[in-house]
C-alpha cells in the first residue's frame, strides 16, 4: 500500500484526473487474458510518456508553466485599473473590483467542466479550446463601452482560462516520476503565483489620466521629484498586453505539445491497430469504460459536497488554503493603499514594485519545497516508510512564516518608518503562501488517494469563491482599520490556523483511520 504514494504530488487547481493518473505510469500488462486489449508494452514502451527524454519533459513543463502565468496574470492585471475605470464608468472603486473577483469566480466554475473533459478527450483538446477562448475574451474587455460587457468578459475569460489551471497538473503527472514530478509541480505552482503578482506591476506602464473628459498622456511625479512615468497607453491595454503574449505562447504550445493522457494514447493506439490489421476487436480500457455523465457529476460535484460535510481533514485544510489564497488577492488592493495612499507615493511604477517582495518569497518557497522533497521526502519514498503526514513539516514552517510576515508588513507601514522593511516583509508572506498552498494540497491528495479528484474539486470550489470575495471588502477594511490593524487581523487569523498542520502531523493517522474516504494504510 505504501507504493500508492507515488502519485500524490500534484497540486492541481481542480483535481483533474489525479485518480486516473495514479494507475498510469507502470506500463504493466493487465493480468486478465484479453489479447485484443491494448496496453503499454511494458514499462519501457517508447510511446509511454514516462519515457520521454528529459529535455522533452522539461520543455513541456516550461510551456505549461508559461500558459499558466498568462492565465493567472489576467486575473490580477485589471486590479490596478479599478481607480481609472471607476471614473470612466461612473461607479465606485469597490464595484470595479468585481473585475478581478469575477475572473477568480470563473476559476471556481471552470474546473467542473474542464476536469471531466480532460478525462474524456485527453489533455490537449480541452486545453487548446479553453485557452483559445480565453484569448478571444480579451477583446471585449479591451473594447467594452459599458460595465456589463466588461464584467461578463472578465468572468468568461476566467472560466475558459482555468482550463490550463485544471488540466496542466494532471498532465504533469502523466510523464514525471514521483520525486521529479514534485519539482515540476513546484514550478507550476510558482507560475500560478508569479502571474497575479506581475499583473499590477506590468499595468503601471499603461496608465493614463482623465483630464477634462479626455484621456491624455500622464506624467506622475514622485513627491521627492525626479522620477517620471510616461504612460502613453491606457487601461484597455491590460487586455491587449495579456492577449499578445498569451497568443504567442499558445501558438507555440499548439505546435509543440504532445498528448500525454495515457488512456487517450492507448485509445489512439487501438484505433491505429484496427486500421492497420483490419481486426476490429482491438480496444482500450477507455473504449470499455468511458465515464458516464452520472459518474462525472458524482466525482466532481456530488461527492465533493458530501466530503465537505464529513471529512475534518478536508474541511480544515480547505479553510486554511482558502485563507492564504484570499490574502494573496486581497493584497492587490492592500498594497496600493499601503504605498500610494499611506506613504503618498505618487508614481504608480514605484508603488507597484513592493509586489516584488512577495515574488521573491514565492520563489524562495519553491526552492525550499524542492530541497525538502529531495532531502526529506525522497529518501522516505525509496525505503517505503512515507506517509501523508510527511508532507506537513514544510507547511508547519510556512504557517509560522506567514503571520510573521503579516505583522511585519502591518507594523512597518507608518510613513515615519522607511519603506524598505515593509517591502521586505513580502518575502516571508510569499514563502508562507506558496508553501502552505503546495504542501496542503499535496497532503490532501496523499490522504484521499482514489477519491483525490473529489477532494480537490471541493477545495477548489471553496478556495476560489473565498479569493473572489476577499478583494471586495479589502478597501473598506484597510480604510477603516488602517494598514497596521487590518493586516494584523489577517495575522491573527493566520495564527489561528497554525494548529491545523501541527495537529494533523501528530494525529493525522488516527483521524484518517476514522475517514469514510481515506484508504486504510
From Swiss-Prot:
**What job does the chain carry out?**
MFS transporter; part of the gene cluster that mediates the biosynthesis the mycotoxin citrinin, a hepato-nephrotoxic compound to humans due to inhibition of respiration complex III.
Query: Which portions of this protein are annotated as coiled-coil regions?
Result: none
Q: How does it sit in the membrane?
A: Multi-pass membrane protein
Its keywords, alphabetically, are: Glycoprotein, Membrane, Transmembrane, Transmembrane helix
Q: Name one GO cellular component term.
A: plasma membrane
GO MF term set: transmembrane transporter activity
**InterPro entries per the UniProt record, alphabetical:** MFS, MFS_dom, MFS_trans_sf
Q: Mind telling me which residue stretches traverse the membrane in this protein?
A: 58-78, 95-115, 124-144, 155-175, 182-202, 237-257, 313-333, 349-369, 392-412, 417-437, 465-485, 489-509
Region listing for Disordered, in residue ranges: 1-29
What name goes with this protein?
Citrinin biosynthesis cluster MFS transporter ctnC
Gene3D superfamilies per UniProt: MFS general substrate transporter like domains
Subcellular location, record wording: Membrane
